């Protein structure tokens, strides 16, 4: 959520930065400014009325103490004025509440401001490739490389038909070595991240609306999430939601920062806007597994922590010897809550292209304002909002897809197991 004070003081600058997001969306600050002005006027009116009401109460007590007749005309006149003020104050209360709710609704619908260092652009075509790694692992010959779902079906480790039978489209069942590979990837990733200082969390995978509001999925993306009928509970789209919201409405000590968590969870998404895209395989499912990295940090350290987050996600791909590239997103391709974002894209030889496998975002204080996560420094007055960051470390299904394609040996029809996973799987080939 954006800072209302900033919007009031610098509306033109805020408007210009919002307009950088492009994508055909428009963000009108005028309704916010108008309601904020009306709310402020009501607050001022209430302050004046409350002050006069308090003054009358004291005045009545003083006059009676000085001998005035409690039933006399002077006291009765003051009491009538006091009663009138109470009625006016009571009338103001719902008006202020309504204005506050209107203002909150409009503020929650505004996306985050792009970071000043985020490249300006209109769409993903304007994103900037900042790094490419692993060219030595690219296959010299891609003839005979099958898409990962065909490899999985041939090996009997991906069963799409039964996944659809049990649920519906965009569900799969992992069988035998496929299930073992998924589990091995989860354990490998968690151990690597714990080894560099992340604390593991196993959070709820059902969360309430306040949690989704805090991290920015609600109200804008309600249709992309699965809600439990009859309960204020939603299946999580990412572990970012429960892990970040562990600290909702809390004031942390400065000494606790930075907080670094990793978490494995199943994730659930409707993929409402992807009809007809990636209908086969592991790339775009309604249910998938992911290891997530989440950080809560001091504002002045968030840029450096962001770079470290990207490096931690990269380390997994490097250990697996999977070719990838790092892309910096432009303003027109930023996610709703992100101020700055890097995507890691892994090489899929069957498609002869790179596909996103991790999105590492710095939200600045956008989520912290929504979730009310602050920190306090000893000896100093007041509190500050933390900066939040998160990224996949990594998406398990997409990692498996990349392994199946990059390690597939057409001559034997087998898939070599990456060296770092062989101890987990107790085998060299699938």
UniProtKB/Swiss-Prot annotation:
Highest taxon of the lineage: Bacteria
A GO molecular-function annotation: serine-tRNA ligase activity
Gene Ontology CC annotations of this record: cytoplasm
Keyword Aminoacyl-tRNA synthetase: yes
Main location: cytoplasm
Keyword ATP-binding: yes
Annotated EC: 6.1.1.11
Pathway in which this enzyme or protein is active: Aminoacyl-tRNA biosynthesis; selenocysteinyl-tRNA(Sec) biosynthesis; L-seryl-tRNA(Sec) from L-serine and tRNA(Sec): step 1/1
Binding residues for ATP: 269-271, 356-359
GO biological process: selenocysteine biosynthetic process; seryl-tRNA aminoacylation
Class of enzymatic activity (EC top level): ligase
Location within or outside the cell: Cytoplasm
Reactions mediated catalytically: tRNA(Ser) + L-serine + ATP = L-seryl-tRNA(Ser) + AMP + diphosphate + H(+); tRNA(Sec) + L-serine + ATP = L-seryl-tRNA(Sec) + AMP + diphosphate + H(+)
Binding site for L-serine: 238-240, 292, 392
Family: Belongs to the class-II aminoacyl-tRNA synthetase family. Type-1 seryl-tRNA synthetase subfamily.
Record text about domains: Consists of two distinct domains, a catalytic core and a N-terminal extension that is involved in tRNA binding.
Function in brief: Catalyzes the attachment of serine to tRNA(Ser). Is also able to aminoacylate tRNA(Sec) with serine, to form the misacylated tRNA L-seryl-tRNA(Sec), which will be further converted into selenocysteinyl-tRNA(Sec).
Subunit organization: Homodimer. The tRNA molecule binds across the dimer.
Record-given protein name: Serine--tRNA ligase
Organism of origin: Synechocystis sp. (strain ATCC 27184 / PCC 6803 / Kazusa)
Gene name as annotated: serS
